[in-house]
């Protein structure tokens, strides 16, 4: 890291550069306009501005069509929101496979719902601690994603994410996801109908809706047969309504679930008869 570097390098000829990995990593003073750089040959932008806490410039015009890894590109680049410009939403991200922690810990809140994410395999920590992010990303192709660990996480709570108020996130293809651990942990506003998600390959749901107070959806259609860890699933949250809780317990109790799984539904209350029967069936299966 070069914490004092802040020179005007916006006119550099970068037309043959293939990697910008960690270029401004920990360059906490850097905040120069580099939006006109030719990035057409760049394939790696891993941690490019990570911890460059002063950087807040418009990079909308960058050609990122060849970039395969963007993990932690702006991670902990705390001031970054593309200088308030929405053009970053036009980036061609079709080659990217890794978006891990891309906007973690930033002020970023730009409309990126049209990004091509068809080749992305990991979105873990992508918006973790990005407290202001609340855009509609329901149109993303998540069919290749395997890891959504802590995607919208903040341990202290206060995340504003609710998919921009749109239920479109219900259409995400999550058939290849194996971990949703802490995915919405600390998202008090999130409450979208995601009951149709394919969770058949998910093994880890630990803390998934921890402190997600607003979340109240019917999850009865979720396939939880692969889940081995669901500890503190909704701990600290208000929980589901009796209707949704009964329905969820009913759908899950009819499945051949793994033995020895602990789960916490926060403040959820089942009905005296029906819900209790479903609960007992799950307990009998080792939950």
Show where each model-derived region lies.
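Negatively charged
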Residues: 1-287
């Amino acid at each position: 890291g070069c914490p004092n570097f802040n020179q005007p390098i916006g006119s550099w000829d970068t037309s043959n550069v293939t990697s910008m990995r960690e270029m401004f990593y920990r360059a906490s003073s850097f905040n120069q306009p580099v939006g006109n750089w030719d990035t057409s040959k760049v394939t790696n932008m891993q941690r490019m501005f990570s911890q460059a806490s002063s950087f807040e410039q418009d990079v909308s015009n960058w050609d990122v069509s060849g970039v395969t890894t963007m993990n932690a590109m702006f991670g902990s680049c705390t001031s970054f929101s593309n200088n308030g410009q929405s053009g970053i939403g036009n980036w061609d991200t079709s080659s990217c496979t890794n978006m891990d922690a891309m906007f973690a810990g930033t002020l970023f809140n730009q409309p990126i719902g049209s990004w091509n994410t068809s080749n992305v395999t990991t979105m873990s920590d992508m918006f973790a601690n990005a407290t202001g992010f609340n855009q509609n990303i329901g149109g993303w192709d998540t069919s290749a994603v395997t890891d959504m660990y802590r995607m919208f996480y903040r341990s202290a709570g206060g995340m504003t994410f609710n998919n921009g108020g749109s239920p479109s996130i219900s259409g995400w293809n999550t058939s290849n996801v194996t971990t949703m651990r802490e995915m919405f942990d600390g998202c008090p506003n999130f409450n979208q109908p995601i009951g149709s998600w394919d969770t058949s390959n998910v093994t880890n749901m630990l803390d998934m809706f921890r402190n997600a107070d607003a979340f109240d959806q019917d999850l009865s259609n979720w396939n939880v047969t692969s889940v081995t860890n669901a500890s503190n699933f909704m701990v600290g949250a208000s929980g589901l309504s009796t209707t949704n809780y009964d329905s969820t317990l009913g759908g899950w109790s009819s499945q051949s679930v793994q033995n020895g799984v602990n789960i916490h539904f926060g403040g959820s209350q089942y009905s005296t008869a029906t819900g209790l029967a479903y609960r007992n069936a799950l307990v009998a299966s080792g939950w």
